[in-house]
Design a protein with these regions (language model features):
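Macromolecular interaction modules
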Residues: 1-108
Length: 108
């Protein structure tokens, strides 16, 4: 069985300072505590598009799980719903995009 991840892409916030404070102080601890079944959490701060132009996203969070069914179970749980609602609440640049993906890993 392939592993899976939840990807949350946050648009550039209208209030950068408030978003970053709430993301670090509230959201990340909430995700760590309440997202049942996760195996890894990766938070990326987007600097630019590859061509150095301004990116449409400010942060991308990736939360890894053993399977897609584990992602779905987490999102259906009270902790998953609370964490997703909080992501929407703090995202002052618009609603974040939530994606579920199957993970394939290639080692070199």
């Amino acid at each position: 069985m392939k592993s899976a991840k939840l990807i949350v892409m946050y648009p550039v916030p209208t209030d950068l300072e408030t978003f970053e404070r709430r993301y670090a102080e509230e959201h990340v601890p909430m995700a760590v505590e309440k997202l049942a079944g996760k195996t890894r959490f990766v938070a990326s701060l987007i600097k630019s598009n590859a061509d150095q132009s301004a990116a449409q996203f400010h942060r991308i969070a990736e939360v890894y799980f053993p399977s897609i069914s584990d992602v779905q179970a987490c999102l259906s749980s009270p902790g998953g719903q609370e964490t997703a609602a909080h992501a929407v609440e703090i995202s002052s640049g618009g609603t974040p995009t939530f994606l579920i993906s199957e993970v394939e890993t290639f080692d070199f």
